[in-house]
């Protein structure tokens, strides 16, 4: 593209970084970086009553964790600030006055009760609810009368009639709206704060935003924003609206959906890797060419093509996320995965709160056993249950294995050799099992399966010698003794 690409992610600090918002930020970031453009983070904080104390800092912290490095924001002013909407009143106020002076906006003194009554009557008549324009042409005398009654006005934009607003959406194609279906809408609330659709259009223009990429739920906001651009004689940015994210039942992803964790913070807490979430979220509504699904951030930037954004809803597949994270887990060194797993082991009282070096070394060996199968670091706790609790009651299949004819002989030989073994390490344990094989003539499944069942209570699991080392000599001998 010949012009400089500038995109923005504009969260509200009324909440934490949600999967849907993370996807919006991520697609904007990839689009900007692909075209060597600017990724701007702007804070839409005018809803002061709902703002969370740590909402803003949480947004930035989680964006940074995901690897989304912004070019401009509250900490990097490149001349387009302020980057908080609440600090941009000096920009909005003259423009509001200009619209009033040009009769493109007017003061409306209707009360909430009057507006609600109008809405109810329209619905009862089967009409689409919209403001009827009762205060669109007040006389000065009428305005003064309302002021004297103590009514505080909102300011409404005067919607042009019989006009079609059309834009070419980069995802959905051409979309049109009839202005006659849109009532005169509020641009400034009674408390003097500009509304979203007014402020966002002003901000995008003054910040030189070239492309607005956002969720499907913003399509209906676009004609109102186009009206603002038209009223000031400005060129509008290009728009792209991403498809919905749906759950596995194909229903819109809702914050009330208890089946799916909704916030990036929750995945961090469970021990997911940022690269894996970056990868997984990028594939929610966008697809690369070919079959490959695992890419680095740099590879995604290189191959990102907005033409491959999907019109169809993107399904949040939990199994797919587990698979993607597991692919990244396998590539990490054990120390990295152990550091992610350590808080979970401590929380479950499986490792002391202030672990010694010996505790940590044991923990690393435990993590190494399961690293290739872990979906996330916190999964180490349920996976390694056998190391910390009494053996579960054996199932029918396990009973059949442990009741084999050669098992007593096998266990007697193994017990004696392991009891004398020092140091109790995987390499020596492996040799010991081979010695037992030679001495007894028992081999293959008849050798390994009874040993595994005897010490773990399970038919399958990680490398047997390593498992025995991590279980520890005392626990292994105690469990073997039952079958000698």
From Swiss-Prot:
E.C. code: 6.1.1.17
Enzyme class, spelled out: ligase
Keywords: Aminoacyl-tRNA synthetase, ATP-binding, Cytoplasm, Ligase, Nucleotide-binding, Protein biosynthesis
Location(s) in or outside the cell: Cytoplasm
Motif 'HIGH' region in this chain: 11-21
Main subcellular location: cytoplasm
UniProt entry tagged with the keyword Metal-binding: no
GO molecular function per UniProt: ATP binding; glutamate-tRNA ligase activity; tRNA binding; zinc ion binding
GO cellular component terms, semicolon-separated: cytosol
Reactions this protein catalyses: tRNA(Glu) + L-glutamate + ATP = L-glutamyl-tRNA(Glu) + AMP + diphosphate
GO biological process: glutamyl-tRNA aminoacylation
InterPro entries from the UniProt entry: aa-tRNA-synth_I_cd-bd (IPR045462), aa-tRNA-synth_I_codon-bd_sub2 (IPR020751), aa-tRNA-synth_I_CS (IPR001412), aa_tRNA-synth_I_cd-bd_sf (IPR008925), Glu-tRNA-ligase_bac/mito (IPR004527), Glu/Gln-tRNA-synth (IPR000924), Glu/Gln-tRNA-synth_Ib_cat-dom (IPR020058), GluQ/Sye (IPR049940)
PROSITE patterns per record: AA_TRNA_LIGASE_I (PS00178)
Binding residue positions for ATP: 255
Top-rank taxon, per record: Bacteria
Motif ('KMSKS' region): 252-256
UniProt xrefs under NCBIfam families: gltX_bact
Subunit structure: Monomer.
Protein task: Catalyzes the attachment of glutamate to tRNA(Glu) in a two-step reaction: glutamate is first activated by ATP to form Glu-AMP and then transferred to the acceptor end of tRNA(Glu).
PANTHER family: GLUTAMATE--TRNA LIGASE, GLUTAMATE--TRNA LIGASE, MITOCHONDRIAL-RELATED
Family from the record: Belongs to the class-I aminoacyl-tRNA synthetase family. Glutamate--tRNA ligase type 1 subfamily.
Protein name: Glutamate--tRNA ligase
Organism of provenance: Staphylococcus haemolyticus (strain JCSC1435)
């Amino acid at each position: 593209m010949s012009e400089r690409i500038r995109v923005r992610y504009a969260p509200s600090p009324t909440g934490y970084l949600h999967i849907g918002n993370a996807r919006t930020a991520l697609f904007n970031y990839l689009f900007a970086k692909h075209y060597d453009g600017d990724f701007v983070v702007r804070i839409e904080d005018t809803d002061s009553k709902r703002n969370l104390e740590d909402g803003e800092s949480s947004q930035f912290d989680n964006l940074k964790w995901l690897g989304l490095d912004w070019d401009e924001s509250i900490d990097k002013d490149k001349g387009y600030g302020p980057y908080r909407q609440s600090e941009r009143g000096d920009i909005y106020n003259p423009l509001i006055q200009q619209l009033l002076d040009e009769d493109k906006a007017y003061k409306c003194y209707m009360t909430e009760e009057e507006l609600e009554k109008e809405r109810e009557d329209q619905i009862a008549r089967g009409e689409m609810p919209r403001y009827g324009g009762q205060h669109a042409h007040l006389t000065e005398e009428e305005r003064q009368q309302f002021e004297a009654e103590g009514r505080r006005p909102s300011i409404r934009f005067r919607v042009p009639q019989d006009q079609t607003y059309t834009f070419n959406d980069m995802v959905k194609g051409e979309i049109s709206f009839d202005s006659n279906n849109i009532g005169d809408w509020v641009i400034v609330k009674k408390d003097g704060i500009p509304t979203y659709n007014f402020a966002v259009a002003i901000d995008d223009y003054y910040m030189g935003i070239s492309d607005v990429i956002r969720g499907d739920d913003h399509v209906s906001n676009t004609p109102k924003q186009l009206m603002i651009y038209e009223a000031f004689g400005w060129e509008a940015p290009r728009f792209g609206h991403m498809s919905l994210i749906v759950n596995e039942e194909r229903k819109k992803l809702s914050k009330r959906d208890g089946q799916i964790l909704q916030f990036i913070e929750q995945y961090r807490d469970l021990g997911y890797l940022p690269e894996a979430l970056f990868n997984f979220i990028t594939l929610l509504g966008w697809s690369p060419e070919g079959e490959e699904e695992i890419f680095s951030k740099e590879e995604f930037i290189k191959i990102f093509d907005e033409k491959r954004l999907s019109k169809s809803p993107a399904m949040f597949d939990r199994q797919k996320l587990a698979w993607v994270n597991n692919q990244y887990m396998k590539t990490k060194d054990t120390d990295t995965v152990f550091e992610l797993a350590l808080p979970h082991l401590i929380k479950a009282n499986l490792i002391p709160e202030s672990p010694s070096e010996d505790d940590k070394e044991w923990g690393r060996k435990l993590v190494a056993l399961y690293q290739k199968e872990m979906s996330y670091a916190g999964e180490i706790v349920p996976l390694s249950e056998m190391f910390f609790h009494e053996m579960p009651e054996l199932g029918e299949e396990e009973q059949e294995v442990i009741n084999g004819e050669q098992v007593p002989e096998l266990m007697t030989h193994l017990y004696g050799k392991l009891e004398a073994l020092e140091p109790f390490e995987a390499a020596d344990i492996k040799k010991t099992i081979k010695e037992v094989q030679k001495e007894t003539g028992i081999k293959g499944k008849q050798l390994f399966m009874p040993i595994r069942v005897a010490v773990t209570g399970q038919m399958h699991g990680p490398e047997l010698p390593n498992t025995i080392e991590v279980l520890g000599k005392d626990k292994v001998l105690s469990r073997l003794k039952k079958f000698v």
